[in-house]
């Protein structure tokens, strides 16, 4: 049985539960860019890096900015400080996330999920 809706105009696609189709929520803005998969970004990221990126995407405001402190991120992700630090540094290095401390000597700050570069990652 095929269900045709505005969101599903391809008759070859079967939506198993049409009453449960995802929609953007007014309560949050989190989303992931499909190019993470299409341009092979996921293939170069570790599970901790993917988890950190996903978390930041989900808690970001419309400008992509999150101000969660690292201890709250670690608690939400159930990882230790070293693992989070390594994951974030890789995301900064790949230019997927930018960081600005709350103040000059603060250890916490603003994380911004950046628009994806036009090309995929440089894979060695």
Predicted regions and their residues:
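Short, charged/polar, Gly/Pro-enriched secondary-structure boundary elements
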Residues: 117-123
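Acidic, metal-coordinating catalytic segment for phosphate/diphosphate chemistry
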Residues: 32-34
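Winged helix-turn-helix DNA-binding recognition segment
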Residues: 2-5, 39-48, 59-117
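N-terminal leader segment of winged-helix/HTH proteins
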Residues: 1-28, 95-96
